[in-house]
Swiss-Prot record, chain A:
InterPro entries: Creatinase/aminopeptidase-like (IPR036005), PA2G4/ARX1 (IPR047113), Pept_M24 (IPR000994), WH-like_DNA-bd_sf (IPR036388), WH_DNA-bd_sf (IPR036390). Its EC number is 3.-.-.-. GO terms for molecular function: metal ion binding; metallopeptidase activity. Gene3D superfamilies: Creatinase/methionine aminopeptidase superfamily (3.90.230.10), Winged helix-like DNA-binding domain superfamily/Winged helix DNA-binding domain (1.10.10.10). Component of the nucleoplasmic and cytoplasmic pre-60S ribosomal particles. Probable metalloprotease involved in proper assembly of pre-ribosomal particles during the biogenesis of the 60S ribosomal subunit. Accompanies the pre-60S particles to the cytoplasm. It comes from Schizosaccharomyces pombe (strain 972 / ATCC 24843). Keywords: Cytoplasm, Hydrolase, Metal-binding, Metalloprotease, Nucleus, Protease. One of its GO terms (biological process) is proteolysis. The keyword Nucleus applies. This is Probable metalloprotease arx1. Pfam families: Peptidase_M24. GO terms for cellular component: cytosol; nuclear envelope; nucleus.
Swiss-Prot record, chain B:
InterPro entries: Matrin/U1-like-C_Znf_C2H2 (IPR003604), ZN622/Rei1/Reh1_Znf-C2H2 (IPR041661), Znf622/Rei1/Reh1 (IPR040025), Znf_C2H2_sf (IPR036236), Znf_C2H2_type (IPR013087). Belongs to the REI1 family. Pre-60S-associated factor involved in the cytoplasmic maturation of the 60S subunit. Involved in the dissociation and recycling of other late pre-60S factors before newly synthesized large ribosomal subunits enter translation. Residues 113-124, 167-188 have a biased composition (Polar residues). It comes from Schizosaccharomyces pombe (strain 972 / ATCC 24843) (Fission yeast). GO terms for biological process: nucleocytoplasmic transport; ribosomal large subunit biogenesis. GO terms for molecular function: nucleic acid binding; zinc ion binding. Associates with nascent pre-60S particles that have not yet entered the translating pool, and is released from mature 60S subunits. Keywords: Cytoplasm, Metal-binding, Phosphoprotein, Repeat, Ribosome biogenesis, Zinc, Zinc-finger. This is Cytoplasmic 60S subunit biogenesis factor SPCC550.15c.
Length: 417, 463
């Protein structure tokens, strides 16, 4: 296998990269908490997401002013409610004749806020689920129901994975199958299922699983990731080994990689209250998030699309961006051609059936940055909303033990940088 | 003496009328009449008789002379005078021919014996040896052909007799000289050609001989210098010439065996003739203008150093040794692909659309003209994307796709990016149906009819 030595070095986080990771994590967490506080009944999702983007823009401008590397929004603020899974970030297009047609939050909405920031490609992504509640009143009970199950499952699953990564050592390496198994365990204990699009993956500079590059990384065989839904051959193989010898599954399952120290990992787990095989695009909402595929080149015909592309090349990097953040309205004429030619890849609003509720937790962690410390969580884990699930982790199971995390030392960064 | 019966013309008198009438009918009287008209005196009977006698004698002699006829079969000559005949028979030429003729007649006799024996034994139809004709024919060429025919007959029937074989063997060298003069008029047999070739190659020029004059030198180099200095011989594309001795060998062969001019490729009958031609016309250069002429000499040349990817290949091998900048090379190669229909990319493994492209040994790719609009577009290289992120993604993509996938992507990027299936189908049918050719022909047809300049060829079969 061909491996660029410089590239494989970049997988391991050194000191200067570490500070960038930490700054990105701190700032995005700070922004997140401010955005989360805005999620009150009646708030417009358009306003919240634009507020989040403005915050991110402001924060990223405030730091590394003298440096000339790329920095910016790694994921525009998206506010996905209930059965919406990903990428709902309404922009100016939702305002029609002065009316804000974007979704307005209501009490009891399971709201997933995700955002991300990067400095020089070192990226911190965060995603958290909150339940929209009226201002706390005495005697108000917790949020219950399928949504609560999903929220709890997502919370515990992300925590368990983080704990598992923290216990990583060379004697007992963390493998993909172990990560997959613990998430699946927790989902089954809460009677929910893991939503497609969930992933636990190693990230590196500029490579955080963007859809434009994700498949290529897979070809390259350097991608260390656990993804849901599981690739077909993996499940098939797991079935075979299960039928042969259930006890031996972990050791026999194909594990070409395991977690190493000083690696950045992205934990992005979504739990849906109902089992779903795939998400579908929203029929009416047009995608507002786009990502530039730098590996496609085409001679564009429209002047508008050419100038739009040159602006995107100048302003945006390889991360998703909100098309509302592009300066000139006129050039948006060229958007169609750019997407037709696959130069821009739209990130459609993905939804499941209306009765379904999806919860999502996303963390960025760095494994064992120092030999003494165990795990650094770049994004400040937000305490879950006041929810109560009918189910809980059964005592004695692996998942419960890991979630308790007795011997686990997780350090969180200071939000006030 | 009565004068009643007299002839005044001849001044003679007769006894009676009867004798007078006979006289008037006589030749003597007629002769004297003619003399009288010519106002000459009449001749007497005696003189006239003497004259007649002398004329008769002269006539006899002429007659005798005219009756002389001698035919010399050997030399195929006829003689009407004895002196000429006797002098011919005494001549050396006749004696030479005689000896030849005797030998040939012996051969003929043997052949006719053979032929008749074959004819009698096999009763084959259309026996090609027609004895009577051949015996009359003195032409050596026809003898030779008949011998060839009889030879083939012999081998066909497998009844070769020892004496005829030896006879043939001895007769061949002797016949060569005779056949020389007939080489260009008669159709030569394989044996003749071989013999001629052997004769010519025996006098072939050595590398130390000048091609254009009779001079000979001590070494090949001095010979070359001489040809360059005094005949101003110029060797085309000298820097790519790899096999100089073979080239001169070939040229010498061409001149001394083929008797062919180097410049105009005209054939002559002898080495002297072709040399004279070349010197007179100044044809002392090697023809190297047309493609055929270049191909003729292509064995002695090696043009690989002139190929565009030659230097690149060498660079690559150098680069691979240090191993780190191999990636960069790729970009450079694709960057300078401004003449996009002739890209010097890594060839041979581009899987796309073989039917639309030709892969030249030099590494160039030639696209079909039906896709020219795609080949001609000047694509900005994707490396124009700014920033580290873009370059990292491109690196990942480039490394991810190894071999065919990468080549495919390269091909897509540089040549037929954005060619849709419909267009490809159009191209396929374009190529399949010879559309270009047909379109040209139809246009020529249309213009011909419109301008009344269409060529009309009558069908030869209908005439």
């Amino acid at each position: 296998m061909e491996l660029d030595p410089s590239d494989s070095n970049s997988r391991v986080v050194d000191a200067s990269q570490f500070s960038k990771y930490r700054d990105a994590g701190a700032l995005v967490s700070k922004a997140f908490h401010q955005v989360a506080s805005r999620c009150v009944p009646g708030a417009s999702t358009r306003e919240i997401s634009s507020y989040g983007d403005n915050l991110l823009h402001e924060y990223k401008s405030s730091i590394y002013k003298s440096q000339r590397f790329e920095k910016g929004i790694a994921e525009p603020t998206s506010i996905c409610v209930n059965n919406c899974a990903y990428n709902y970030a309404p922009g100016p297009e939702s305002v029609i004749a002065g009316n804000d047609n974007s979704y307005h939050l209501q009490v009891g909405d399971v709201t997933k806020i995700s955002m991300g920031l990067h400095f020089d490609g070192y990226t911190a992504l965060i995603s958290h689920t909150i339940v929209v509640t009226p201002p706390p009143q005495p005697g108000m009970g917790p949020y219950i129901g399928p949504g609560a199950d999903a929220i709890c499952a997502a919370h515990y699953a992300s925590k368990a994975v983080a704990n598992l990564l923290a216990t990583n050592n060379s004697d007992d390496p963390i493998t993909g199958s172990r990560l997959r198994k613990i998430v699946d365990d927790i989902a089954s204990q809460f009677r929910v299922s893991v939503c497609p699009g969930s992933r636990i993956r190693r990230i590196s500079r500029f490579l955080v699983g963007q859809p434009t590059i994700d498949r290529l990384e897979e070809d390259q065989n350097t991608k260390h990731a656990v993804e849901w839904p599981a690739p077909e051959e993996e499940t098939r193989k797991a079935d075979v080994t299960n039928s042969l010898d259930p006890a031996n599954v972990l050791s026999t399952e194909l594990n070409t990689w395991h977690v190493m120290p000083k690696e950045a990992w992205l934990i992005d787990i979504s739990m849906s209250s109902q089992p779903i095989s795939s998400l579908k695009e929203h029929p009416d909402l047009k995608p507002t998030l786009y990502i530039h595929d730098v590996n496609v080149s085409y001679m564009l015909k429209l002047k508008a699309s050419r100038s739009l592309l040159s602006e995107i090349k100048k302003e945006k990097s390889v991360f998703p961006f909100h098309f509302g953040s592009l300066s000139s309205e006129r050039n948006l004429l060229g958007l169609r051609e750019l997407t037709d030619r696959h130069i821009l890849v739209p990130m459609p609003v993905l939804i499941s059936s209306p009765s379904n509720v999806i919860a999502r937790e996303e963390l960025t962690v760095i494994t064992q940055p120092n030999p003494s410390s165990d795990l650094l969580c770049l994004t400040v884990p937000t305490p879950p909303s006041y929810v109560k699930s009918d189910f809980s982790l059964e005592d004695g199971t692996d998942a419960a033990l890991i979630c308790e995390g007795i011997n686990v030392n997780i350090k969180s960064i200071n939000i006030n940088v | 003496m009565s004068t009643s019966f007299a002839c005044t013309t001849c001044t003679v008198a007769f006894n009676n009328a009867e004798s007078q009438k006979i006289h008037w009918k006589s030749d003597w009287h007629h002769y004297n009449l003619k003399r009288k008209v010519a106002s000459l005196p009449p001749l007497s009977a005696e003189v006239f008789a003497g004259k007649i006698l002398s004329i008769q004698k002269q006539n006899e002699e002429v007659q005798k002379k005219a009756e002389f006829y001698q035919n010399c079969e050997v030399c195929n000559k006829k003689f009407y005078s004895e002196g000429a005949y006797s002098s011919h028979m005494a001549s050396k030429k006749h004696r030479d021919n005689l000896s030849k003729f005797q030998r040939n007649s012996r051969i003929k006799k043997l052949q006719s014996e053979d032929a008749s024996s074959i004819a009698s034994s096999t009763l084959s139809m259309g026996e090609p040896v027609v004895d009577s004709e051949i015996e009359e024919e003195e032409d050596l060429a026809s003898q030779l052909t008949s011998r060839a025919i009889s030879l083939s007959n012999l081998s066909l029937h497998g009844r070769e007799s020892e004496p005829s074989k030896t006879e043939l063997a001895t007769s061949i060298p002797q016949s060569n000289e005779a056949s020389k003069s007939h080489l260009f008029t008669q159709e030569p047999t394989p044996e003749e050609i071989e013999a001629e070739l052997a004769r010519r190659s025996s006098q072939r020029l050595s590398p130390r001989d000048c091609l254009f004059c009779a001079a000979s030198f001590s070494s090949f180099d001095t010979c070359k210098k001489h040809m360059k200095a005094s005949h101003s011989l110029y060797i085309p594309e000298r820097e790519y010439l790899v096999d100089e001795p073979s080239l001169f060998d070939y040229l010498a062969e061409k001149i001394s065996i083929g008797f062919t001019c180097l410049t105009c490729n005209r054939e002559f009958k002898s080495l002297e003739a072709v040399r004279a031609h070349m010197q007179q016309k100044g044809h002392t250069s090697i023809a190297y203008d047309t493609e055929d002429e270049q191909l003729e000499l292509s064995d002695f040349y090696d043009f690989t150093t002139s190929y565009p990817d030659y230097a690149v290949k060498q660079d690559e091998t150098v680069v691979e040794e240090d191993g780190s900048s191999g990636e960069g090379d790729w970009e450079d190669v694709s960057d300078d692909s401004d003449n996009s229909s002739l890209d010097s990319l890594e060839m041979g493994r581009v899987p796309i659309a073989d039917e639309y492209e030709l892969h030249l040994p030099s590494g160039n790719r030639v696209g079909h003209r039906s896709l020219s609009r795609y080949f001609r577009q000047n694509l900005h290289s994707s490396s124009t994307a700014v920033g580290d992120g873009a370059s990292i993604h491109q690196n990942v993509a480039r490394r991810a796709m190894s071999g065919n996938a990468r080549a495919y992507r390269q091909a897509v990027e540089t040549s037929i990016a954005g060619v849709r299936d419909g267009r490809k189908n159009y191209s396929a049918s374009h190529i399949k149906s010879f559309q270009d050719q047909r379109r040209r022909e139809e246009f020529a047809n249309k213009m011909g009819i419109k301008n009344n300049t269409k060529k009309h060829f009558r069908d030869a079969l209908l005439q």
